[in-house]
């Protein structure tokens, strides 16, 4: 039988791989973001709100962290605002200063309406292939290869991932990250942003040419809409993998075959030298675990607010998404 512990505060600093705002070049520091905030795939968050979840642990529906031994620890609430990649302030409840949802915003609306994304979306996705599903999903799985390192190694951070996202908004994603400070790649699993908290798994290394598999799937029996999910990120080449087990906190009806996200990119040669990445074997399943044979992928490119204009393009088939940069 599990035992519930007392509330705990975040006592361990977020992983050192995650860049602090204080360490960003001046031109990449959004105005108003505190110096101690951490850069994540979802924007900038207070260190106390960026939390690690270990192997065999699980985030429960009420935000409790269930440890591998069954002990449950009630996590401290995140009371600090966070910021999108371009500095839009977001309350822990996901609302902006105008009282409107921020991260759901125009991207979700565009998928639903099958229309272009308006300018100035408040997230860091530069390119994404996705669609809005009227049926609750049960799984998305995709494969991709780690691209060559950039020829211009600076302090850029670049993320690639498939994902499932809700209107809550919560996003579950297996992530490949490149970090210019170390000129290296890593893999991890993420869940954001219920009540302003970002959860991340252990990190495992990757290198150019490695084959990667990302798998986000419900753990309930097929045929029921499920709130219990695993996010598995595997380096098929090395045989290593990480898992984040979590509650979904909403219906994950925004499906993404692949996305590109970037921070502190000053020139096009700071992207991987291949110029593109292809997500292959992309398969979407509904809550009955019936495969969606022809997902209606929408190709969304939001580079309108970027000073740097590279070769941003998207190509999709029923089972692939190629992102050009």
Describe each model-derived feature in a short phrase:
Residues 8-325:
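Exposed, interaction-prone regions of secreted/extracellular proteins
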